[in-house]
Swiss-Prot record:
The keyword Repressor does not apply. Its main location: cytoplasm. This is N-alpha-acetyltransferase 38-A, NatC auxiliary subunit. SUPFAM superfamilies: Sm-like ribonucleoproteins (SSF50182). It is found in: Cytoplasm. Component of the N-terminal acetyltransferase C (NatC) complex, which is composed of naa35, naa38 and naa30. GO terms for biological process: negative regulation of apoptotic process. One of its GO terms (molecular function) is RNA binding. Keywords: Cytoplasm. GO terms for cellular component: cytoplasm; NatC complex; nucleus. It comes from the Eukaryota. Residues 1-29 are annotated as: Disordered.
Length: 113
């Protein structure tokens, strides 16, 4: 059975079709996730909180583990700007994730001869 990446990033099992190419859709999804490992990302949650941290892993339920995570609360009228709360290692339940934004890598990286 081949794994198919759905729109929200979760995978589901499907039966193989006759017209499959050499690279299965599950392989593409796996490579995409592997390319995001150890990258900084911002996760927006359903309750308005934002978590920023280093992407370490995910599971079949779309839960995400962030390292060196910081929590930012949604600003309110009484407290317009709040300091981030340092969480360290944080697990974000997949059903609470609204959006994920990945930090761009630096344009140039040092080259060694």
């Amino acid at each position: 059975m081949a794994a198919v990446l759905e729109e929200n990033g979760c995978s589901r099992q499907s039966s193989p079709s006759a017209g499959d190419s050499d690279a299965e859709p599950g392989d593409t999804a796996r490579h995409k996730l592997e390319s995001l490992l150890n990258r900084n990302m911002r996760i927006e949650m359903t309750d308005g909180r934002s978590l920023i941290g280093c992407f370490l892993c995910t599971d079949r339920d779309c839960n995400v583990i962030l390292g060196s995570a910081q929590e930012f609360l949604r600003p309110s009228d009484s407290f317009p700007v709040r300091e981030p709360r340092v969480l360290g290692l944080a697990m974000v339940p997949g059903h609470h994730i609204v959006s994920i934004q990945v930090e761009l890598e630096s344009v140039t990286s040092p080259q060694y001869i």
